[in-house]
Regions:
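Short alpha-helix plus adjacent loop in nuclease-associated cores
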Residues: 4-53, 57, 95-103, 193-202, ...
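Short, amphipathic alpha-helical segments that act as regulatory/interfacial helices
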Residues: 34-37, 59-62, 66-69, 73, ...
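Short helix-capping/linker segments at secondary-structure and domain boundaries
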Residues: 41-43, 72-73, 127, 166-170, ...
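Glycine-rich, often acidic, oxyanion-interacting loops/wings at catalytic, nucleic-acid
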Residues: 60-146
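HhH-family (HhH-GPD) DNA N-glycosylase catalytic core used in base-excision repair
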Residues: 81, 85, 89-103, 169, ...
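Phosphate-backbone recognition surface of nucleic-acid-processing proteins
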Residues: 146-149, 155, 161-241, 273
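Basic, amphipathic alpha-helical segments enriched in Lys/Arg and hydrophobic/aromatic residues
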Residues: 236-273
Length: 273
């Protein structure tokens, strides 16, 4: 309201600069931050819009409920396994059906499993409610529909990408998105030593998870051929499958950024490669 610009500093850079001081105190920190601002030795970070933060909050809440649901499923599966009952791989509503069948066959387990199962059923309903809200967001936004044209990318992944990037034009190159999301390998070079390590894992961990899951869907579930799927399949044969999925996730991030900025859709033809 006073007309002053609001600038947010990169906390990692500020911490590295302030760590040079011998004594840590609020006074020294305030003086150090003032010196950084005066000299301009700081990296400014993007302040996301309220809409992006609103979507992001829903995605985080949904992810937490999914984690709780998985933990409960593993807990019930472990309890039943200790009693000689093996449920096998399943999740969500399929897991609920197996639990109901199990309780029908062995009524004595009702007092043991039913309290956990009731919480599990509530979590499923709440996750479904979040899914409906996110789908409503995706239907009203043409950009999200175009992002969903990429094989393996659903409404949750598309919304997560929109809320994480917020402004696609702040990247000079589409390849910078991969580094921003922590999907590029770290590099250490000194003299004759030049070593490439694992991915940096900087940035949004939830977005990386969604892109990795999208890459997994592309390789294992999507049947329709595309240049992206062909490239990923060949890469998975040459290197470890997990590394290939990370590479596909990085390429997906670049493709999503290009689709967002160009106003195009995913091209399935060979000419698109």
């Amino acid at each position: 309201s006073l007309g002053y610009p609001v600038i947010c500093l990169d906390a990692r850079h500020a911490k590295a600069a302030l760590s040079m001081r011998i004594n840590k105190s609020d006074k020294n920190d305030a003086q150090g931050l003032a010196e950084l601002a005066r000299m301009g030795w700081f990296r400014e970070i993007k302040v996301k819009s309220m809409e992006s933060r609103n979507i992001r909050a829903r995605l985080i809440a949904r992810a937490k409920l999914v984690d709780l649901r998985r933990d409960l499923e593993n807990q019930m599966r472990g309890l039943l396994k200790s009693l000689g009952i093996v449920l096998g791989k399943s999740a969500g509503r399929t897991f609920s059906k197996k639990i109901i069948n199990c309780l029908g066959e062995v009524p004595d387990l009702h007092s043991l499993i039913m309290p956990l199962f009731s919480v599990h059923s509530t979590l499923i309903e709440q996750i479904s409610q979040y899914d409906l809200e996110l789908k409503d967001f995706s239907r009203s936004d043409p950009t999200i529909k175009r992002l969903m044209s990429v094989p393996g990318v659903g409404p949750v992944t598309a919304l997560a990408f929109i809320s994480t990037i917020d402004d696609p034009h702040r990247f000079n190159r589409a390849s910078d998105v991969g580094a921003y999301l922590g999907l590029t390998p770290r590099r250490y070079q000194s003299g004759e030593l030049d070593r490439t390590g694992r991915i940096s894992k900087r940035g949004d961990s939830l977005m990386r998870t969604y892109l990795f899951e999208a890459a997994n869907v592309l390789l294992k579930i999507v049947r329709r051929g595309s240049p992206l799927k062909s490239w990923g399949t060949k890469l998975a044969k040459r290197i470890a499958t997990k590394k290939a999925k990370v590479a596909i996730a990085r390429k997906m991030a670049v493709i999503l950024h290009c689709i967002w900025t160009d106003g195009t859709q995913f091209e399935w033809s060979r000419n698109a490669s």
